[in-house]
Amino acid sequence: MVMEKPSPLLVGREFVRQYYTLLNQAPDMLHRFYGKNSSYVHGGLDSNGKPADAVYGQKEIHRKVMSQNFTNCHTKIRHVDAHATLNDGVVVQVMGLLSNNNQALRRFMQTFVLAPEGSVANKFYVHNDIFRYQDEVFGGFVTEPQEESEEEVEEPEERQQTPEVVPDDSGTFYDQAVVSNDMEEHLEEPVAEPEPDPEPEPEQEPVSEIQEEKPEPVLEETVPEDAQKSSSPAPADIAQTVQEDLRTFSWASVTSKNLPPSGAVPVTGIPPHVVKVPASQPRPESKPESQIPPQRPQRDQRVREQRINIPPQRGPRPIREAGEQGDIEPRRMVRHPDSHQLFIGNLPHEVDKSELKDFFQSYGNVVELRINSGGKLPNFGFVVFDDSEPVQKVLSNRPIMFRGEVRLNVEEKKTRAAREGDRRDNRLRGPGGPRGGLGGGMRGPPRGGMVQKPGFGVGRGLAPRQ
């Protein structure tokens, strides 16, 4: 029976899932995805302030990866593209966010070129790997808070725990046959069914081991589940077809034999499996811990300076600021009556202005929209309508659900006098709330309750590697 080659997209998705799992659990094994002629570029600048040069070969790539100090990395994959390229290779482009050592998530883009390994059909290694952080290219510090994105990041990571890394020094390769779509719903790109591009199954282990694992057709457990998650029916059909034809090469069958009952994947003695795909290096998203700390304080310092300088600016030049562009202060919209404006809080950190504007356009004509993404998280913003009627319509329809799942904090825009009055009241009340009224016993619990955020931080990631 002739095996049908998986589509490039299925290969790309499976590779991305396996690669980023390894980045989280055993970054010291990443070099096995590469070969002696592989090149690796991981953003950043050298000591002279120039873009860092690429490194070549497994040894240098391993040294470079270890210099990044990847610890407890978390990755949120937003989009994966994959196309067939020369000599039966596959080009994979990944866009998402990466957090290193529980720092804020940073947007990144990574491109892999997967080349056939040659010794076995449907085996690939990473020939080229280019990684860049978005803030390094466009400036600014584009981040998302680790707490908010934790839920999305955690779920894929739990799925990714199943892949086991093969400790072969010969190089880690990716098995195309085992194409299970364990990525988040974000990865719902349509799969081009016609493309029969060879997408190797990343079986890093010796051929003998692969043959031993062939008997168990476990693909059905992983692929159908993933196919359902993919919004486009085409990927689901392809995934099912590949599963039926390639059951003997199922990555799941390999891992099911070696994984402990709990499903935890050992970091060091990783059982042989086809997970070692040389294509994805989301780890790069998380810059070395040594680099991140200096940047965050600078950003926090800038934010503090802005907050300190803003109050005096509001009074003297409200009209000038109304025309300025920026995401920090709402005073730019002073030229519009307060009755035409709405304050919007709890905005998703990746929200786009055009998307938000289209959402509120259903209530009335939006003449201006601003999002504050440079201060404390989560983001907030202001929407300005050409009339007060849309404002009242929005307020009467509260709660406002954005994307059907995010509840926005929508309030009337307060005048400066009202805001200052609220601040004075808060200062007089203090952190414990108004004195008198409620008994002392009532003040303690609320404060304690506000400290802990159930759902965030719980299971934030795997335990740090020993």
From Swiss-Prot:
SUPFAM superfamilies (UniProt xref): NTF2-like (SSF54427), RNA-binding domain, RBD (SSF54928)
Name of the protein this chain belongs to: Ras GTPase-activating protein-binding protein 1
Modified residues (Dimethylated arginine): 460
Modification sites for Asymmetric dimethylarginine: 429, 435
Gene: G3BP1
Region span, RG-rich region: 410-466
Annotated ranges, domain NTF2: 11-133
Functional summary from the UniProt entry: Protein involved in various processes, such as stress granule formation and innate immunity. Plays an essential role in stress granule formation. Stress granules are membraneless compartments that store mRNAs and proteins, such as stalled translation pre-initiation complexes, in response to stress. Promotes formation of stress granules phase-separated membraneless compartment by undergoing liquid-liquid phase separation (LLPS) upon unfolded RNA-binding: functions as a molecular switch that triggers RNA-dependent LLPS in response to a rise in intracellular free RNA concentrations.
